[in-house]
């Protein structure tokens, strides 16, 4: 019974379902990747606080970080690979008998009263027949076990999907409309809204702990936005960040499964560097100097460097 329980995991190792979850931009998207990219971008756009723009006509400017590149992910999943060879090899004795044809030659010589007869026997140099006999037993025994993964995974990432920017821009416009904010051409706007999308892509990872294995695909959307009154140059919305990530994960045991499939959407880490602590220089004479007396009551935090300069340190 113990032997049977040990053999079952070895036989079933690497038996499972392979789901296509490539890197961002690798040809036609799988449904899983589409779902994750859409979920993270929708969540990030939905988090945008646009209350300060109520009743305004906004011109929208969206800038997205480029994601063109090329890469290659190759190599199958890790799995046990064992081989047992053995053990017994025997060749029987072999004997071959050849049969060569023979022929007789007789020569008679006469000279007057003398005569002689010569008789000789000759063999051909090629056998007319051959007979081989084997004696004894011949046997060969071997045993082998080889367990491989579910296959080689290869992904090509070359070109970005040109529709991504259009999709994200349409999502932002949809949220503006649902919030009651009118998006108009720049010549009819009283407010300029700038949205910078720093992160908009996917990250694929694989966890291999021999007994526990996992395939994970994450989609992240991180953006920063601010709004300016076109006439007064007041900063209606200080630079704010919205960041979300969605995740799809398959969990395996000895690459059997997946026994668990999960999807999550959550807030992710903010931008490593944002512009929320930037304020105008005190001696600026620019006509379009932004006014940080904001209508939404959200005054940006002043950085340590700015405080040091104000104190003359």
UniProtKB/Swiss-Prot annotation:
Covalent lipid sites (N-palmitoyl cysteine): 15
Subcellular location: Cell outer membrane
Signal peptide start and end residues: 1-14
Membrane-topology descriptor: Lipid-anchor
GO terms of biological process kind: cell adhesion
Comp. bias (Polar residues): 282-297
Lipidation sites (S-diacylglycerol cysteine): 15
Keywords for the protein's UniProt record, in alphabetical order: Cell adhesion, Cell outer membrane, Lipoprotein, Membrane, Palmitate, Signal, Virulence
Spans annotated as Disordered: 282-313
GO annotations of cellular component type: cell outer membrane
UniProt main location, coarse: membrane
Stated family: Belongs to the MafA family.
Name this protein carries in UniProt: Adhesin MafA 2
Organism: Neisseria meningitidis serogroup C / serotype 2a (strain ATCC 700532 / DSM 15464 / FAM18)
Gene behind this protein: mafA2
